[in-house]
């Protein structure tokens, strides 16, 4: 659901640079405490980038492809759920929302690239119980 993703948290605020706190999840705490998991996760990030799947340019091309598929449905969507309506208060049109998604992808991709470059894959402290 777009209003709870791509830098949105359901209240129409732009949260593009807020880091996701994996420490809030017991599962992620335990996984990230394992050096083998951190190593595999980092390797997967780099592999998917090298294959072009997670390259920023590829992600943006994918957004553009979805745009061309969805454009014909936009009028019906806004007829059903008008911009700045009672349950969704936002004046952005389809094009503005796509630009926000692309902006978010650029910011998040850079954050993740830095995160994985700086990730320690050596031993970590045991996950808290």
Residue ranges and their predicted role:
Residues 2-129:
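Middle-to-C-terminal accessory/interaction subdomains
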């Amino acid at each position: 659901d777009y209003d709870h993703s791509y830098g949105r948290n359901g209240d129409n605020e732009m949260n593009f640079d807020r880091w996701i706190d994996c420490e809030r999840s017991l599962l992620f705490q335990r996984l990230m405490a394992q050096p083998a998991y951190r190593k595999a996760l980092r390797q997967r990030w780099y592999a998917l980038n090298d294959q072009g799947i997670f390259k920023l340019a590829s992600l943006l091309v994918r957004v553009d492809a979805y745009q061309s598929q969805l454009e014909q449905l936009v009028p019906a969507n806004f007829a059903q759920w008008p911009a700045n309506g009672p349950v969704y208060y936002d004046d952005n049109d389809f094009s503005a929302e796509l630009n926000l998604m692309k902006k978010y992808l650029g910011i998040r991709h850079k954050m993740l690239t830095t995160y994985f470059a700086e990730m320690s894959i050596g031993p970590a402290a045991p996950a808290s119980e």
